[in-house]
C-alpha cells in the first residue's frame, strides 16, 4: 500500500495534478528543490527532503537525496523482518512510490554552445541512484520515470486501495532500467566523442564507445526467410518522417521484408517536391515518377515495369485520393504508404483488407547514422544525403544538355541514388523508363535497363541516363547510346574518364559529371 511518495522531477509535465491526486488519496509527499517549491506553491502539503532527513542539501545541490533515510526507505524488503526492524530501529519510514525523471543531459549537449562544464553539471547522480534502488525493489516500491504513466498508477491505486499490483510495478521497473541505461549510454557517447576534453573544441561524430538504444515495436512472424526469427525495433531518437513512426490503418501484420522495402520506398519518395510515386520490389525502385497528382504519378511509375510492380510496395508523397486508390486497387500490392489517405480512398481499400495502409508524416529529419552489421562488428557511416547543386555540375562534352534534358538528368540522378549498385537508370518526362540494378558489371546493368524498357513497350529515344558511379570503360556508355539515350549524368573519377568523354563526343551526346558517387549495397 502506498503511504509515502518521493517526487523529484526535471520534466514537470503533469506533476502538480498527479501530486494533488496522490495527496487526495492520503499519500504523504516528499520532494526536493524546485519540485518541492512548485508543489508548495500549488497549495499541496509537501515535506522537503532536507527536513525529512535532517541533513541539508549541499555542494550546490549535488547532494540532496544520497542519504540512508531515503535509500533505506526505498530498498527495504517489506517481507524480511530484519529489514523492517532495521528501519524501525533507525526511525526510517518506507517510501512506497518514487517519481523521478532526470536532468536533461541529451537536450543540453544538443545545444551548439554546450561546453564540457555544462554537460557535466547535467549528469544526474541522485536521480539515477534512487531510480535504480526503487526498480531493484519493485516488488514493494512503485517507480515512475515517465509522465505518461501517471494516469496508469493513479487508476490502479484508486481501484485497489492505494495499491499498485506487481505486473505494473515490474513493467515500470523495466522501463526505469532501460531509461537509466540509455541515459548512461548518452553520457558515454558524449564523453568519448570529445576530441579535446580540456578545451572542448570539437566532437567526433564517431565516439570511441557507441551506445545505441531501440525499443521493440513488435515481434515479426519471421525474418527475411521463414526459417529466420525477427523483430522490429524503433530508434528512440527516430526523427519525424521516419518509417518507424508509421501508423497502420488497415491490413495484415507487416513482415520483415515489408518493413525493409517500405523504408526504401519512403526514403526515395520523400526526396521529390512534385507529387511523386515510387514502386519498390526487393528494395529496388522498379518505377518512379512525378506527375500532376498522385494518380498521374502512379500511372507513370507503374508503366515503367508492370511485371515487377506485381506485389510491390508503393509510396506517395501526397495524399492518396479516390482516383489514385482506384488505380492502385486494380493491382496486387503488399503495402501502400502516404502522408494521408482520403476517406474515399480508405473506402476503396476497405474491400481489400489484406492491403497494408501506412500513414507517415512527411518530415525532413533523417537518422543520425547508417548502420550495417558485419561479422563481430558494426559499420557506421553518415547518411548518403548529399544532393548536388547546379553549380556543382560540370558539363564535360562539346554538346550541352537542353533544359528538358537537364530536368530529365536531375530526375534520373535522384532515382539512381536509391537503386542497388551497379545502377543504370533511363528516364524521360518525369518517369523512369528502364532500371538496371545490382549487377556486378555496369555494362550489364545498362543492358538490363534497356531490356526492361523494351519489355514495357517504352521508347528510350531521347532519354536521359544516370549512373550511380563512373563508367570504367566506354562500353557501358555505348550501350545506353545505342538504346537511344542523348544525355548522361555520372560522377566521373575513372582513370578512363577522357576515353568515356571522347566516346560521348563521338556520339554527340551531352554528359554531366557530378563529382558525387552513390554506391548502394
Swiss-Prot record:
Q: What is the superkingdom listed in this entry's lineage?
A: Bacteria
Q: Which GO terms describe its cellular component?
A: cytosol
Q: Which reaction does it catalyse?
A: (6R)-10-formyltetrahydrofolate + 5-amino-1-(5-phospho-beta-D-ribosyl)imidazole-4-carboxamide = 5-formamido-1-(5-phospho-D-ribosyl)imidazole-4-carboxamide + (6S)-5,6,7,8-tetrahydrofolate; IMP + H2O = 5-formamido-1-(5-phospho-D-ribosyl)imidazole-4-carboxamide
Keyword tags: Hydrolase, Multifunctional enzyme, Purine biosynthesis, Transferase
Q: Which SMART domains match?
A: AICARFT_IMPCHas (SM00798), MGS (SM00851)
In the UniProt record, does the keyword Hydrolase occur?
yes
What are the EC numbers? 2.1.2.3, 3.5.4.10
One GO-annotated biological process of the protein: 'de novo' IMP biosynthetic process
Pathway named in the protein's UniProt entry? Purine metabolism; IMP biosynthesis via de novo pathway; 5-formamido-1-(5-phospho-D-ribosyl)imidazole-4-carboxamide from 5-amino-1-(5-phospho-D-ribosyl)imidazole-4-carboxamide (10-formyl THF route): step 1/1; Purine metabolism; IMP biosynthesis via de novo pathway; IMP from 5-formamido-1-(5-phospho-D-ribosyl)imidazole-4-carboxamide: step 1/1
Please list the GO terms describing molecular function: IMP cyclohydrolase activity; phosphoribosylaminoimidazolecarboxamide formyltransferase activity
Positions of the MGS-like domain: 1-145
One Pfam family named in its UniProt record:
AICARFT_IMPCHas
Per the record, what about its domains? The IMP cyclohydrolase activity resides in the N-terminal region.
Q: Can you tell me which family this protein belongs to?
A: Belongs to the PurH family.
Q: What's the protein name? A: Bifunctional purine biosynthesis protein PurH
Q: Which organism is it from?
A: Burkholderia cenocepacia (strain ATCC BAA-245 / DSM 16553 / LMG 16656 / NCTC 13227 / J2315 / CF5610)
Amino acid at each position: 500500500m502506498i503511504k509515502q511518495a518521493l517526487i523529484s522531477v526535471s520534466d514537470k509535465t503533469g506533476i502538480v495534478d498527479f501530486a494533488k491526486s496522490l495527496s487526495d488519496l492520503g499519500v504523504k509527499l516528499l520532494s526536493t528543490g524546485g519540485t518541492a517549491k512548485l508543489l508548495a506553491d500549488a497549495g499541496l502539503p509537501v515535506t522537503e527532503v532536507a527536513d525529512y532527513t535532517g541533513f541539508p542539501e549541499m555542494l550546490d545541490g549535488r547532494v540532496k537525496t544520497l542519504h540512508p533515510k531515503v535509500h533505506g526507505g526505498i530498498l527495504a524488503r517489506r517481507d524480511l523482518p530484519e529489514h523492517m526492524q532495521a528501519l524501525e530501529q533507525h526511525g526510517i519510514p518506507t517510501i512506497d512510490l518514487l517519481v523521478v525523471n532526470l536532468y536533461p543531459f541529451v537536450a543540453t549537449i544538443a545545444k551548439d554552445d554546450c561546453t564540457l562544464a555544462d554537460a557535466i553539471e547535467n549528469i544526474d547522480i541522485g536521480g539515477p541512484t534512487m531510480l535504480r534502488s526503487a526498480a531493484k525493489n519493485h516488488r514493494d516500491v512503485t517507480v515512475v520515470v515517465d509522465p505518461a504513466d501517471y494516469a496508469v498508477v493513479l487508476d490502479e491505486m484508486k481501484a485497489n486501495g492505494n495499491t499498485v499490483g506487481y505486473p505494473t510495478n515490474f513493467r515500470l521497473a523495466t522501463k526505469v532500467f532501460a531509461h537509466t541505461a540509455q541515459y548512461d549510454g548518452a553520457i558515454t557517447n558524449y564523453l568519448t566523442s570529445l576530441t579535446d576534453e580540456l578545451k572542448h573544441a570539437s566532437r567526433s561524430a564517431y565516439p570511441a564507445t557507441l551506445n545505441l538504444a531501440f525499443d521493440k515495436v513488435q515481434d515479426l512472424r519471421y525474418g527475411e526467410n521463414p526459417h529466420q526469427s525477427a523483430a522490429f525495433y524503433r530508434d528512440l531518437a527516430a526523427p519525424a518522417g521516419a518509417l518507424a513512426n508509421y501508423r497502420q490503418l488497415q491490413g495484415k501484420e507487416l513482415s520483415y521484408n515489408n518493413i525493409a522495402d517500405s523504408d526504401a520506398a519512403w526514403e526515395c519518395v520523400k526526396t521529390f517536391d512534385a507529387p511523386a510515386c515510387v514502386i519498390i520490389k526487393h528494395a529496388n525502385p522498379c518505377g518512379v515518377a512525378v506527375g500532376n497528382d498522385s494518380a498521374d504519378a502512379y500511372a507513370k511509375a507503374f508503366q515503367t515495369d508492370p511485371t515487377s510492380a506485381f506485389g510491390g510496395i508503393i509510396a506517395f508523397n501526397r495524399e492518396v485520393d479516390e482516383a489514385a486508390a482506384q488505380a492502385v486497387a486494380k493491382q496486387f500490392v503488399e503495402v501502400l504508404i502516404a502522408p494521408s489517405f482520403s476517406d474515399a480512398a480508405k473506402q476503396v481499400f476497405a474491400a481489400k483488407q489484406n492491403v497494408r495502409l501506412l500513414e507517415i508524416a512527411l518530415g525532413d529529419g533523417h537518422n543520425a547514422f547508417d548502420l550495417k552489421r558485419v561479422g563481430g562488428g558494426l559499420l557506421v557511416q553518415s547518411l548518403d544525403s548529399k544532393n548536388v547543386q547546379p553549380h556543382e555540375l560540370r558539363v564535360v562534352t562539346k554538346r550541352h544538355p537542353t533544359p528538358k534534358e537537364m530536368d530529365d538528368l536531375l530526375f534520373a540522378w535522384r532515382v539512381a541514388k536509391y537503386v542497388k549498385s551497379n545502377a543504370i537508370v533511363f528516364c524521360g518526362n518525369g518517369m523512369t523508363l528502364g532500371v538496371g540494378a545490382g549487377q556486378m558489371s555496369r555494362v550489364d546493368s545498362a543492358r538490363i535497363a534497356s531490356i526492361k524498357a523494351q519489355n514495357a513497350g517504352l521508347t528510350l529515344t531521347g532519354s536521359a541516363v544516370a549512373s550511380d558511379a563512373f563508367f570504367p570503360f566506354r562500353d557501358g556508355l555505348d550501350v545506353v547510346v545505342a538504346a537511344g539515350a542523348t544525355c548522361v549524368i555520372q560522377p566521373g573519377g575513372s582513370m578512363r574518364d577522357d576515353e568515356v568523354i571522347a566516346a560521348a563526343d563521338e556520339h554527340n551526346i551531352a554528359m554531366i559529371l557530378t563529382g558525387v558517387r552513390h554506391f548502394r549495397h
